[in-house]
Swiss-Prot record:
Membrane topology: Peripheral membrane protein
Chain residues that bind ATP: G170, D171, K172, Q173, T174, G175, K176, T177
InterPro entries cross-referenced by the UniProt entry: ATP_synth_asu-like_sf (IPR023366), ATP_synth_asu_C (IPR000793), ATP_synth_asu_C_sf (IPR038376), ATP_synth_F1_a_nt-bd_dom (IPR033732), ATP_synth_F1_asu (IPR005294), ATPase_a/bsu_AS (IPR020003), ATPase_F1/V1/A1_a/bsu_N (IPR004100), ATPase_F1/V1/A1_a/bsu_N_sf (IPR036121)
Subcellular location as annotated: Cell inner membrane
Pfam family name, one: ATP-synt_ab_C
Gene3D superfamilies membership: 2.40.30.20, ATP synthase alpha/beta chain, C-terminal domain, P-loop containing nucleotide triphosphate hydrolases
Described function: Produces ATP from ADP in the presence of a proton gradient across the membrane. The alpha chain is a regulatory subunit.
Name the UniProt record assigns to this protein: ATP synthase subunit alpha
Subunit structure: F-type ATPases have 2 components, CF(1) - the catalytic core - and CF(0) - the membrane proton channel. CF(1) has five subunits: alpha(3), beta(3), gamma(1), delta(1), epsilon(1). CF(0) has three main subunits: a(1), b(2) and c(9-12). The alpha and beta chains form an alternating ring which encloses part of the gamma chain. CF(1) is attached to CF(0) by a central stalk formed by the gamma and epsilon chains, while a peripheral stalk is formed by the delta and b chains.
Entry's Gene Ontology cellular component terms: plasma membrane; proton-transporting ATP synthase complex
GO molecular function, one term: proton-transporting ATP synthase activity, rotational mechanism
Keyword annotations of the record: ATP synthesis, ATP-binding, Cell inner membrane, Cell membrane, CF(1), Hydrogen ion transport, Ion transport, Membrane, Nucleotide-binding, Translocase, Transport
Family, as annotated: Belongs to the ATPase alpha/beta chains family.
Length: 503
């Protein structure tokens, strides 16, 4: 037997050492020191990032919210019923991500982007961080394309443009959600993906919204994210950020999206709850000092991008609930100052039968005017002023009975215009039909129609136009303006219809 040479042995050993791979998992692990109300205090995770996802040995997950000198405050996603003192916590070295893209469209998800509609898993390789930097000034373009809601009072008086943030504000039970759902239903065929984020709502209310969207075929281009009242404060806090991450995907891929946050008052309350448990110092109304920032960084992500970035857009309709009409409370004033205008809904108007209950005097769109089509501008140019004068006259007539002819005429016209702006829920109207009926009211075609019959007049006018003069609607739709010929034809059509219309 030949003896092995010493060099050969050493070279074999050397080779083995070189090729040796240590196959083991490195994990940074900490321990729970205390756990209460959905917040865990964890010791031993020194290198953790802000808002990094952490895994508990119980299977629960959470995010690092407070980075203190000797411990980390972790917001737990669920209720963490099995977490107790001594539970191990592991770093994932990942920030919070949610699935994005066309795979999420038509689905109902929770705040973590997990499906809750029983239609199986979401099959996608595309994920996005829920916290992203908003586009800078140079990446944006001013709002100039209309986003029509199908609601006459909004499209005529407080128009919304793609990339705008328009607040819907009012007391509870004034129709705020209905306005938002109408806007979603009206996006059918407009190539706009809609995202509805329900924060702290009843499960039954959200189920009703989903049912309505399915009924009107809007679920085909919509995503519903639900963090209901029965979910933890952490889930309610994260839901809008998950929603906006999904919307941003379409915005950044040269497409258009609309996101509804229903509602940000409950979002602020959830954040207050988390902050107080994390022992952050409370400020006004016990909200933490950065409550303005949580909403500003959320709403700034809605934008109209410049042509170099693909000209996509993300439009936001945040909803805020007021208490007894008090718009000067902390959260309402914060969000009014962040957004580009507000639609103010009033209880008194709602109960007097004016629905949608939009207070035209307090509602405003700061940038939407540039996005309004010319035809709407032409017919509703003086509408806001006319309605304001009508309200003034109406108040005056309560203690003065004798009015001159001009004032009487103005009062009569005002009453009819209020009727024209009434609209049933879930029945958005195409812009060309809005132009026709507002034109009819503004130019006096309804003066001889009794106030109670104005709604009926409109209901009969649209089928008449579709059957006999579809070209009028078609021309308004394509030209987006009323020229002399089109206006003359519209007058002729309205006069003809008035002859056939019987009350």
């Amino acid at each position: 037997m030949s003896q092995l040479k010493l060099e050969e042995i050493s070279s074999v050993i050397e080779e083995k050492i070189k090729n040796f791979e240590l196959d083991c998992d490195m994990a940074e692990v900490g321990k729970v020191v205390s756990y209460a109300d959905g917040v865990a205090k964890v010791y031993g995770l020194n290198g953790v990032m802000s808002y990094e996802v952490l895994e508990f040995e119980t299977g629960d997950k959470g995010v690092a919210a407070n980075l203190e000198e000797d411990s980390v405050g972790v917001i737990v996603f669920g209720f963490g019923n099995n977490i107790k003192e001594g539970t191990s916590v592991k770093r994932t070295k990942n920030l919070m991500k949610v699935p994005v893209g066309d795979a999420v469209v038509g689905r109902v998800l929770n705040a973590l982007g997990e499906p809750i509609d029983g239609k199986g898993e979401i099959e996608t390789n595309e994920f996005s961080l829920i916290e992203q930097k908003a586009p800078g000034i140079m990446d944006r373009k001013s709002v100039h394309e209309p986003l029509q809601t199908g609601i006459k009072a909004i499209d005529a008086l407080v128009p919304i443009g793609r990339g705008q943030r328009e607040l819907i504000i009012g007391d509870k039970q004034t129709g705020k959600t209905t306005v938002a759902i109408d806007a979603i239903i009206n996006q059918k065929g407009q190539n706009v993906i809609c995202i509805y984020v329900a924060i702290g709502q009843k499960e039954s209310t959200v189920a009703q919204v989903v049912r309505k969207l399915e009924e009107y075929g809007a679920m085909e281009y919509s995503v519903v994210i639900n963090a209901s009242a029965s979910d933890s404060a952490a889930m309610q806090y994260l839901a809008p950020y998950s929603g906006v991450a999904m919307g941003e995907y379409f915005r950044d891929h040269a497409r258009h999206a609309l996101i509804v946050y229903d509602d940000l008052s409950k979002h602020a309350v959830a954040y207050r709850e988390i902050s107080l448990i994390l022992r952050r110092p409370p400020g006004r109304e016990a909200f933490p000092g950065d409550v303005f920032y949580i909403h500003s960084r959320l709403l700034e992500r809605a934008a109209k991008l410049c042509d170099e970035k693909g000209a996509g857009s993300l439009t936001a309709l945040p909803i805020v609930e007021t208490q007894a009409g008090d718009v000067s409370a902390y959260i309402p004033t914060n969000i009014i100052s962040i957004t580009d205008g507000q639609i103010f809904l009033e209880t008194d108007l709602f109960y007097s039968g004016i629905r949608p209950a939009i207070n035209v005097g307090l509602s405003v769109s700061r940038v939407g005017g540039a996005a309004q089509i010319k035809a709407t501008k032409q017919v509703s140019g003086t509408l806001r002023l006319d309605l304001a004068q009508y309200r003034e006259l109406q108040a005056f007539t309560q203690f003065a009975s004798d009015l001159d002819e001009a004032s009487k005429k103005q009062l009569e016209r005002g009453q009819r215009m209020v009727e024209v702006l009434k609209q049933a829920p879930y029945s958005p109207l195409p812009i060309e039909k809005q132009v026709v009926i507002i034109y009819a009211g503004a130019k006096g075609f309804l003066d001889s129609v009794s106030v109670k019959k104005v709604v009926d007049f409109e209901e009969q006018l649209h089928p008449f136009l579709e059957a006999k003069y579809p070209q009028v609607l078609e021309e308004i739709h394509t030209k987006k303006a009323l020229d002399k010929d089109l206006e003359a034809m519209l007058r002729k059509v309205l006069e003809e219809f008035k002859l056939t219309y019987s009350e």
